[in-house]
Amino acid sequence: MQPTKWLEENDANLINDLSKLVGVQSISTDGAHQKELDDCAELTCTLMKSAGLNNVAVLKTGNSNPYAYGEWLGAPGKPTVFLYAHHDVQPVMGFESQWQSPPFTLTERDGRLFGRGAADDKGAIVTQLGAIASYLQTKKELPVNVKMLVEGEEEVGSSNLQGFFVENKDRLMSDVIVVCDTGNAEVGLPCITYSLRGIVELKITVKSATTPVHSGSAGGMLADAAIALNVILARLYWGHKKLPVPGIYDKVRKLTGTEKRAFRKIGGEEPKWRSDFGVLDGVELALESKVHPNEATWRKPSITVIVEAASSVAGKSNQVLPEALAYISCRIVPDQDPAEVFEQIKAVLTKDPPWGVKVEVTPTAQMKWWMTDPTGPSFVAATKALKKGFGVKPVNIGCGGSIGFVGPLAELFGGAPALLLGIEDPISNAHAPNESLHAGDFRKLTASISNLFEQIGNLPDGKVK
């Protein structure tokens, strides 16, 4: 039996495997689901064994959440492919009523598979294991060696991952990296991501007094920290121009003419973007004038206020608030320096504070951008595999998000090519209510990865770069 035939005959089993994974509430963001994280790692190991992987184990480093690991090293002389996915997910708290079906019950509807983690990133676990099983259950061997790692703390920043890689370098060393944690620009259009934005996150705290004061006594006299904070944050408003942060564009790498033309061909027109992101009628897209959405989200810096707090609804009172805070996330692009960008934003936020309030700005997280040249033997192999799996030639795209380990891991592996293959699409709603995975693309990606093993295994002299 051919691997493709095996995938067709075992489609229901693969969907069932995904259903089992989605059913485990492996939420890593709140510290209250450690048992579920452990259970999900164990379940992933069980699925690895069923697919035919060897040396399967739950691994940890320090106080990390569990990793699931398995390997098959029965192809001497052939390249080794490192597969990455993650089994932890985002919570649904506060948005349960917006789900049209139970978030932790995989539900097929309108050609899509709904459930928390279906797209991000449990679907990737099943596509990778399905591709592995399609060979090991039919040919009893793979065209390449495979090492597979499924992480348990991606959704909380992967703080232990780099240390885990260094600690287990010899065990993990591979020739090609394959990550399925990015998106496709459209349903049915396979995409290879060759750039990722980085991130600079910071906290701003504004203080005006040592204690709250009754607004009847001090309202109109005492500086309101919440208003002062919002006056400061308003300095970041860009309208339809560039970000009003001096120096922030100085090192931004310009798009080539080829990139600009390619980006404008992908992803549709404004009505599609508005529909995909649920933009309300009458609300403008906040684009810089004459900049295409793909260019804006893939290769331009952006600034977002992700948390703002001064009090709570439950604790509301007629007081002048003495303290307010916000967290700001800035996405950075090639060739920006995270430390420089932090200082540039800090300078804007701390200059001439309203009413002379005390302003403190501190860094909370930084992650470098990543970019590679999407050519060379491994990228040719991926292009062929995706074209065979999807029936459409793939396109090369950027990603507005961040996957911080890709660059350091490629470097640790001696400059290994990193293939970032899309599993999500514009309406997957990762992290949001009604997260879903397109069932057809799920099957096509599984077939593509199966074929990718063959394409890499057939590279002349095993040269992957």
Give names to the regions the model predicted.
Residues 1-96, 323, 327, 340:
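N-terminal helical capping/dimerization or prosegment-like subdomains
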Residues 78-150, 444:
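Active-site metal-coordination/substrate-binding segment of hydrolases
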Residues 119, 210-212, 330-338, 367:
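A generic structural motif
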Residues 124-140, 158-166, 223-235:
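Active-site-proximal alpha-helical scaffold in enzymes
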Residues 202, 209, 213-275:
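Polar, glycine-rich mid-to-C-terminal structural blocks
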